[in-house]
Amino acid sequence: MFVALLLLLASALPASGVAADQSCEQCLGGAPDAPIKIEVFSDFQCPACRELYMDTMKLVLRDYCSLDKVCVIYHEFPLQGHPYSREAARYSLAAQKLGRLQWTAVVDSLYANQAVWSDKGTVQAAVARALSPDDFQKVLKLIQDPSINGTIERDIALGQKRDVQSTPTFFITALGREQKVVGGLPYNVLKEFFDRIVK
Amino acid sequence: MAVALRILHWACRIVLGGIFLYSGYFKLQSPLQFAAAIAGYKLVPNSFIMPLADYLPWVEIALGALLLSGWKIRYVSIGASALLLAFIAILTVTYIRGIDADCGCFGFGDKISPRTIARDVLILLPAIFLAAEERLKNSATNYTNRTK
């Protein structure tokens, strides 16, 4: 019985789950080959996603991604009950095509002003506030690109494949092991976990 | 009477041991998810969250294995009861504080509610039985001797 128990426990320790696409076009921060990878499935209109981004991921981007210790990948997972989240996701992906700096600025603005645009649907105003007039004009053109909707659909399909049922859900891969986390996690807790792997 | 108690003893050990093993195994699969659940209680300082998430599943697995093995069953059952009482207290306090937190007990998305608290109380019963079994047996023997 104890041998069976040990085998069962051993099976709990290694990685489980589906490894995601390793390309890093959706890498919000850090190098793709960083020792720790976080893949977030997020909805711009979800308050818990806002909390995760503002209170945790922004600090991860600042303290770990800037040193290429952690790679943060954001996947769009707009939920059906949120009427403006797909539009926000489209703007975010259009900004992503301009570069990481513009993309981060748009993501920042969308989450920081979530309460305002979620209420009135003024997504475009939140995006305009984050970009230079030139970049904003480019985003307005890029958002017409049908491939953006394709990327959102691909992200949703990837999330469904990985059994994402609510947002935020994120997957942390480190030391060959993947852990799924549903909901938020305080930055200090995540920091303690990271510091064991990358000082 | 003795046979019934013996059957009850084994049933309690198997059920309780199985529950602890499953619970520990499940938490080991994602200590970070368990850490998120502990953080959700807003009761434990941040610096204790990761150590708790790392070690508590092993404590549960050890208790489960010991309950099944039968070694020092009274003391192990007292330990299991103490752990379950702590869980019940934490869940109750979190629920009373009106915090919408995940139980993190056997699966995620299982919000703390009177149902989750009642479930833990139900699990506590076999642990208390095993811890108090000797006393129950002695009382039963004394009662039988008196009535003879």
Task: Please tell me what each predicted stretch does.
Chain B
Residues M1-N138:
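Membrane-interfacial helix-loop segments of redox and metal-homeostasis proteins
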Residues T141-K148:
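Short, low-complexity, charge-dense intrinsically disordered segments
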